[in-house]
């Protein structure tokens, strides 16, 4: 793998990890907000955040698969 591709892969991977870590923190806060407020909108936002986290995980797995394919 050339250096540019490797750097891009590592940067993308690090970015996904950062998004997931910050997302986990935000998710915990939103769980508290939804629980305390019992407002339907808070649960809607929480649900959207959970889906976004799952999507980022999928993208991370896709990135790893693409990296593996490039390195064949």
Name these PLM-found stretches:
Residues 1-41:
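Extended, surface-exposed interaction regions
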Residues 24-71:
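Amphipathic alpha-helical protein-protein interaction segments
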């Amino acid at each position: 793998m050339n250096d540019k591709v490797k750097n891009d892969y590592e940067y993308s991977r690090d970015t996904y990890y950062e998004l997931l870590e910050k997302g986990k923190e935000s998710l915990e806060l939103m769980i508290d907000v939804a629980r305390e407020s019992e407002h339907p909108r808070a649960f809607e936002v929480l649900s959207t955040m959970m889906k976004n986290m799952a999507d980022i995980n999928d993208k991370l797995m896709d990135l790893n698969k693409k990296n593996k394919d490039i390195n064949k």
